[in-house]
Structures are given as C-alpha cells and as structure tokens.
C-alpha cells in the first residue's frame, strides 16, 4: 500500500495556449457529453464521494486480479460497488463488472479472443455477451484517440459499457481500435496504466494496480515508477485525503511470469482470482479505518 499522482498545467502543448475550461479540466473543441479530453489534467467532479475506485490495466490476468481484489474488499466491508470507478484497459472490465454485480463465473466463462486479433468489433462483441447494452453512471474509462493520441475519459452513463471496455482495451498491435461517436480509440494504458489523476473527486481513493511493483519484473518496475509519480502528485494535491494502493504479492505475480503475453492467458486470469480475493479481504481489514465509507 503506497501513496502518490500526476499534474498538468492546462496548456495546449502544440501552441502554448490555455485550453482549459477555467476549472483545470481540458475540453477539446469537439468534446461531447460523457467524453472529456483530459490530456493529463486532473478530473474535476462537482460532487465529492466518500470513496472512489481506480482499476488499472493488465490483460486477462489484470481482470482476474482486479475483480478478485474488489470482491475481497467488498466482503471485508468496503463498498466498492457503490463507489465511482475509473477503469483502464483490464480495469475497465473490472469497473463495469463490479458496478453491475456481474458474477465472476460469467467473466471466466467468456471465450477470450486469440491474440493478436485484427477482427473489427471483436472486443465489443465479447463485452456485449457480458454487459449487454447496460450503462452505469458510476463507471468511467480511460481511452486514447488514434488521431490525436490524447487521453479521453468516457462516461458509462452516456455510452454502453461494452463500447467503453472495447475502446479502453484495444491494445495497439494486438487488438483493433474501437469507434465511439466517430472517434477511433485504443487502450487507455497508452497514456497511463491507471490514470490516478482522473479519479472521481472523493475523500478516499483505492487504486488496484495489477502491473505495478517489483514482483512483476521489469514491467512492474516501470509501471510502479510511473504510478509512484501519479500517487505522489495526487497526495500533494489532496493533502487532507487518503489513497491506498493494492498491487500483486509475490505469490500472485508468479502467475504473470516474465513473458508479457502471459497477461493474456485466460487460465492465469482464472487462477489469480482466489488469491486476489484473499488479498482484498486482508487489505479491507488494514484500510477500513482509513477509508471514508
């Protein structure tokens, strides 16, 4: 469990002009309801929630890890299902599943697509098997536009969750981009594996980061360094609030191995779930008195 985050000055890097909306939140000229171009700026939310969740990327391994931790936290008395949740890549599946109360058995029974896969709409088709056309106002996801390479935060109250997870999980070179409102999006992890700075405004934040930490090898060390910067900036911005970091233990990290393609192994995702559940249950006991619920 750690604390840290990232910041932005609200200026357009191409011309130096201030392109924020006056609140520190950047909006493009073509912003739509439910689609905010943050490009690194901290999220501005009118309502302050007791708790917000952030679920990071990590392939099918990451889905199993995030959902397992979330279910363990819930069993331990942390109200993750009613907290606004931001998901990136694998984390977008977890955020959606937890908010909708989707049983983990339904997730693991989905047929994972072969990787790499160029079939247009493959992720959306699988996601619709799980989520249908459901929307949910507490879910948002991070995705990156193909044309501008800027991060957008997409609101699950405005778009079907199936489309959001397809956009946020479209790993370049492995899975095809997904189109929403005429824009092509790829994996939000191209910007940040977690996007802690875009978490909903809240008194407490819990970050579940499947890729971060020394036990995850070179990828984990790199992801952990970047996440550390995000957490540090978050704490500097929110000195009166609490943030908790949950990342894989050594035993859990062994399921990922050293080959990055292991992250897309469905069997590893299934195997990691019960261990992640137990970790979430333990963490609930540790952080319960620090989390505003």
Feature annotation, model-predicted:
Residues 1-88, 94-293:
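Patatin-like phospholipase
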């Amino acid at each position: 469990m750690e604390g840290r985050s990232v910041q932005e000055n609200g200026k357009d890097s191409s011309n130096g002009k201030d392109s924020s909306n006056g609140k520190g939140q950047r909006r493009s000229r073509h912003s739509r309801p439910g689609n905010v171009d943050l490009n690194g700026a901290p999220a501005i939310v009118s309502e302050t929630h007791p708790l917000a969740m952030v679920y990071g990327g990590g392939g099918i391994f990451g889905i199993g890890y995030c959902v397992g931790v979330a279910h363990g936290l819930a069993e331990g008395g942390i109200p993750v299902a009613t907290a606004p949740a931001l998901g990136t890549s694998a984390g977008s599946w977890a955020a959606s599943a937890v908010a909708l109360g989707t049983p983990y058995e339904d997730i693991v029974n989905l047929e994972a697509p072969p990787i790499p896969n160029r079939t247009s709409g493959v992720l959306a088709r699988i996601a619709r098997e799980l989520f249908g056309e459901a929307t949910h106002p507490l879910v948002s996801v991070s995705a990156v536009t193909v044309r501008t390479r800027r991060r957008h935060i997409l609101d699950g109250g405005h778009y079907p969750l199936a489309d959001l997870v397809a956009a946020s999980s479209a790993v370049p070179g492995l899975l095809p981009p997904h189109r929403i409102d005429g824009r092509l999006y790829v994996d939000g992890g191209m910007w940040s594996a977690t996007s802690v700075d875009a978490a909903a405004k809240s008194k407490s934040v819990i970050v579940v980061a499947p890729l971060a930490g020394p036990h995850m090898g070179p990828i984990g060390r790199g992801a952990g360094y970047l996440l550390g910067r995000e957490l540090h900036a978050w704490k500097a911005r929110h000195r009166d609030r609490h943030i908790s970091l949950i990342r894989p233990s050594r035993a859990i990290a062994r399921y990922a191995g050293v080959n990055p393609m292991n992250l897309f192994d469905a069997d590893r995702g299934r195997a990691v779930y019960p261990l992640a559940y137990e970790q979430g249950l333990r963490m609930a006991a540790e952080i319960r008195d620090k989390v505003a619920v």
